[in-house]
Regions:
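Beta-strand-rich domain onsets/edges
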Residues: 5-39, 47, 53
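Surface-exposed coil/turn segments at beta-strand junctions on protein surfaces, enriched
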Residues: 20, 60-62, 76-78, 98, ...
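Residue-level detector of high-confidence beta-strand sites
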Residues: 40, 56-58, 70
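Beta-strand signatures of extracellular beta-sandwich domains
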Residues: 42-46, 82-84
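Short beta-strand and strand-turn-strand segments in soluble, beta-rich domains
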Residues: 50-56, 98-99
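Glycine-centered loop-to-beta-strand initiation motif
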Residues: 61-72
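Feature of secretome-associated and extracellular-like proteins
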Residues: 80-122
Length: 122
């Protein structure tokens, strides 16, 4: 009986994984001054086209300081991108001064692999 429950549980977990969209880009923020994740930080994603940046999306970090759902895997996402982390409001909420009003990270996606962009704050 126990084996049946374990098998059913594994089947449900496996099937729920297939039902979810897969994403090519994720990020997270660690606040090393506190030794914890940085939740509720606005992060904007832009793609370079010619000499301009085109907004692709934006999201807030979750309670674990993560965003897991930038750039769906089923499209061609090659190109140069920029993540802009709006950290000043995060520090203001912590009653701290911020040296950086925002942090920009520019990178290039060349294939269909998953890319993860972590940053640390202090």
């Amino acid at each position: 009986m126990k084996n049946i429950f374990v098998t059913l549980f594994l089947l449900v977990v496996t099937m729920s994984g297939f039902a979810q969209d897969k994403f090519q880009l994720s990020t997270h923020i660690l606040d090393i001054s506190k030794g914890q994740w940085a939740p509720n930080v606005l992060v904007q994603l832009e793609k370079k086209q010619n000499s301009s940046w085109i907004k692709v999306g934006e999201n807030y970090t979750d309670q674990n300081g993560r965003i897991k759902d930038f750039l769906k895997m089923n499209t061609s996402n090659t190109g140069i991108y920029k993540l802009t982390f709006q950290v000043k409001p995060y520090f203001e909420n912590q009653k701290m001064n911020s040296f950086y009003p925002f942090i920009e990270v520019v990178f290039e996606i060349k294939d269909n692999e998953h890319y993860h962009v972590p940053i640390t704050l202090s």
